[in-house]
Amino acid sequence: MAIAASCGSLNALTLGLPTRAAVPDAKGALPKQMFIGRGAVSAKTKQRFATDIESIGMLAILRPATTGLAESRRFPEILVLGLHVPSGAAVPVEVIDHIAAQRQGGIVFVCVRDGGPLPDAETGEPIASDAEQCAFAVRRNVPVKPGHTPITKVHAGAWRPAAGSRLTVYGTTMEELWDSLCAQTIADDIDGTDIDARIAARERATFLESEYAKAKAAHARARTTEQRNAAYGKM
């Protein structure tokens, strides 16, 4: 078999994806101009491509024929796209949003960087690391009521050492696979059941934690009993 296209040290095979889904190295590299050369693109988006992205590559194409899963009208195929970003850079959310908006099927983004802060295994606090790192990201539709304007959102997982980063083909249909890949990215869980409800619950919890932290800080800054009581009421 031809050498598989890679992003840093990661390719379809090291990620654990089917060999048949791997894109050959000769066909993997994608020029940035491919994504910003058509239609109206803001100067800010062009700048993001220039500064936030070092290279783009197609790592794998997941289809019924390459996964053994049943077809799905919504997801005839799912692309696995590698984005190499500068050392220490964040997941390029704006670039991901722009690329994913150009097609209807799902895309899993494999973001790779050569070093940056990683959470300490014991304390969870960020510590500097020069190891190659990976973070997965997806752009997913947010459930809305019928007739309402569609909403999408980019979700990214945490940075982790690239060695050992895996994506698992799971489910019986391509749509179930997409839900599973989203769950693997967002919840670090292979089971994509009720993933939208789980995303909503997680975001609600994050919001409440943020509001509690703000109220706690306001309570600490309060100089009068009235101010402290007002802040306490929000906690």
Name each model-derived stretch:
Residues 1-122:
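N-terminal, leucine/charged-rich tether regions that mediate assembly and partner docking
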Residues 42, 169-173, 194, 224:
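Intrinsic-disorder/low-complexity, polar/charged segments
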Residues 93-190:
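Extended assembly-interface/linker segments at domain junctions
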Residues 95, 215-218, 234:
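Short, hydrophobic/aromatic alpha-helical segments in well-folded domains
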Residues 188-203:
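Short, charge/polar-rich alpha-helical segments
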Residues 201, 205-222:
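Non-transmembrane amphipathic alpha-helical segments
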Residues 225-235:
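Short, charged, amphipathic alpha-helical segments
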